[in-house]
Amino acid sequence: MCIRDRFIIVIIMAILSNLELDNKSDITRIAHLACFIVIATITVATFVQTVNMLMTTINTMGTLMQVISPFLLSVLIATGKISTTGIIQPLLLFLASSVGFIVTYFVIPLLSISVAFNVICSISENIRLEKLSKFFSNVSLWTIGVVLTVFLGVLSLETSLSSSVDSLSVKTTQAAVSNFVPVVGKFFSDSFEVVVGATKIIGKTGGIIGILGIVIVGIIPIFKITSIMVIYMLLAAFVEMITTDKLILKYLSGFVNVYKTMLGILIGVVILFVISTGIILNLVNSIVT
């Protein structure tokens, strides 16, 4: 259903609400309920489609992360970051698999419960579940925030420690080859620097391509969710001008909060993958020669 049809149905509901306030007729109540059922069906169907898009996007980014991770890890090994690779590899695999799992089996159910409570509490003023609906929506967003904070904190700490060890190992290897290998030791030491430099360039190029891929995958769903959220915000603002019915306004505002949460979750996951790839790029470029 197009945006125009949604506006028309909302206007009809607002008019019926005003008539219901003036005339307690069963016919107007039934008509109002019928319009609400139509709106609820449309909004829930849109929510389901958006959820499927969100899950597909996150799973695609996870798959992309699994594809570029072996390449970047190979670059780390080639540049002497053996200790770092041993730490980053399980963390990246955990990231790629766990984010999709958390979103699918924890975040999405919480959002679905939030939407269900929003629909139920909008049927009658005597049903008050809006606070509970907002709570479940906020918990789903907090979950992604905690995952992002903990993972990036651990990754940054571990890679900083292991990076120092690996850099020292690289310098020690160069010094040993240069000083103890007769005649050609200095040549091999200088060649090692050239190889490391070339490997860093290759790794940087691959990492940038990976970051661009993640951003491209995430940018279209971000715009779609933003547009849906703006539509509901406009509907809520329009309803507020033409009717005093708080149920319609509460219903639309509830979906605005849900889509804000979904937008925050998707942006958070994109940032998580981009920063993780950026940390690896920084490690590739931090080889001390």
Give the location of each predicted region.
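Short, small-residue-biased leader/transition segments that mark boundaries at the very start
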Residues: M1-I3
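Transmembrane helix-loop junctions in multi-pass membrane proteins
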Residues: L16-D22, A45-M55, G80-L91, C121-L129, ...
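Membrane-interface helix-loop-helix junctions at boundaries between adjacent transmembrane segments
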Residues: T28, H32, I42-V107, C121-F136
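Loop-to-transmembrane-helix entry motif
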Residues: M61-I68, V99-F106, F136-V150, V195-A198, ...
